[in-house]
Amino acid sequence: MTLKWVPALLCAGLLTAQNLPRVDLHAHIHDEDHPAQSLTPAAVAALGKKLNVRFGILAEGGCGGDIHDNASLVEFIDSTAGQPVYRGLQVYGFDWPKCLSPENLKRLDYISADALVFPGKDGKDVLLWLPNVKFDDPQDFMERYVAYTVKVLSQPIQIWANPTYLPESLKSQYDALWTPARMQRVIDAAVAHHVAIELNSHFRVPSAAFVRRAKAAGAKFSFGSNEHVHGIGNIDYGLAMAKQCGLTRSDIYVPTRRSAR
């Protein structure tokens, strides 16, 4: 998939007062705890009209999860046919290009990834968003986390989701742990690989200092609520960061809408 930085090809009503595109590219429509409350693409499109937000429906998977093979990917893509929504896939791991064909991946509007499924020293994955995750040596964790993030950003993806997220136990040390050198290393990787940095409303990341540094380096940004059904369309944090850090329409990534065929 070739990444294109394009103007927001949206109707005039989907722009903010600062002329920024009102696009939520991190919207999950399935509620695993309450499946009956899950949304259809048509319902999402209707909600977008009500909220004045264009949605990117983000499926999850790769070689496992909801999207785990070509059949499940095609089913997801076909479910959005005829709806004014973007189609995205949040991938996990690094083997997903082996499980999903290039032909089907090209039917997506964008692919995102994050570093929150983190390899522990014992070889087991650590799910960084869980509440009881702790690291005895925060500095050692950060060195490994930054290196792993750079690896994630080297993939053929368009959006870095949940950027600079830290486990709950380390959030109070965010400014100290995300040193200028560490920030610059991941920013340089994002810019080099043309990956947009998500302004994430759920986790309220990244920081303004990070956004300013990334803008100075020529990075692009995207808006994402990172919500499941309830709360999708909330891009307030991203809009606030954009205003605070002087982002303009040209700084914001909006996908090229591809045919569902």
Residue ranges and their predicted role:
Residues 43-46, 71-79, 103-106, 147, ...:
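Alpha-helical scaffolding segments of alpha/beta enzyme cores, especially the outer helices
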Residues 19-143, 147, 229-232:
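A metal-dependent hydrolase metal-coordination microenvironment
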Residues 71, 99-111, 133-142, 166-167, ...:
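Short secondary-structure transition/capping segments
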Residues 115-118, 125-219:
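Domain-core and long-helix interface of multi-subunit machines
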Residues 2-13, 18-23, 174-261:
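Charged catalytic cores and adjacent phosphate/nucleic-acid-binding surfaces used
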Residues 14, 36-38, 119, 172, ...:
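Alpha-helical transmembrane segments and their juxtamembrane interfaces
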Residues 26, 111, 162, 197, ...:
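Conserved, mostly hydrophobic/aromatic
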Residues 51-54, 107, 155-159, 246-248:
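Short loop/turn motifs at secondary-structure junctions
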